Amino acid sequence: MFSQKAGPIGIFDSGYGGLTVFDKIRQAMPEYDYIYLGDNARTPYGPRSFEVVYRFTRQAVMKLFSEGCQLVILACNTASAKALRTIQQRDLPDWDPARRVLGVIRPTVEMMDQVSTTKHIGILGTAGTISSHSYSLEIEKMFPHITVTGESCPMWVPLVENNEFDSPGADYFVQKHLDHILSVDPRIDTLVLGCTHYPLLIGKIRQYLPQGVTVFAQGEYVAESLKDYLNRHPEMDRRLTRGGECRFLTTESAAKFSEAASVFLNDPIEVEQISID
């Protein structure tokens, strides 16, 4: 169905947030080729149903596969929660059993026991990620002694997508959700940013955190997990091209994406506008 030639690593997100993961992966593995796809025209994914998120994510993965990607990272917690397993189990065997689609939730959960002293952890995420209970279920399987509290932060993604992460609205919504989750479980000592957009708010988040509570972002752990995965799967590593090239695709305005991406990457980039529906 797709070309068997070696190709780049694909990284997908519903918008800009996955760039925080892409940046950490590229820093850790600069020699590989990458294609980043942001479905900005249909963001946010958080409030959407399982069926819609699966359909959108499936379209994006197919697009990245058609561009030659052999491995795709869903750098979107909502897509990882609502679509990853179905794509892995239902679609990949028909498309190409040798290709892989990986998410960001499991690599994050694997670090949980190391980052918390009290073993009380808070997950800050979209409505879709929190309602799916993906984090709490994974943590319960790996670390049943850890207590997990989830907090849906529906306005945080729009704040980032609209470049308003240092606005009065950001102050209001960040403080509101931090106060609430820490009142539900005052023993929380670690907050996990369970959405790849949220690292852009990390400075604002730290302003409103009490002493003794730390913030845990995903990017570097996903990057380390990917390096480990490729070391353990040399057959996949051989299918990846190395030239240090990066392409950026968006389903919305290329100019708008390029301008916003400079906030995430601190670099001007060329962007292609595409359609995937």
What role is predicted for each listed range?
Residues 1-277:
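Non-catalytic structural scaffold of enzyme domains
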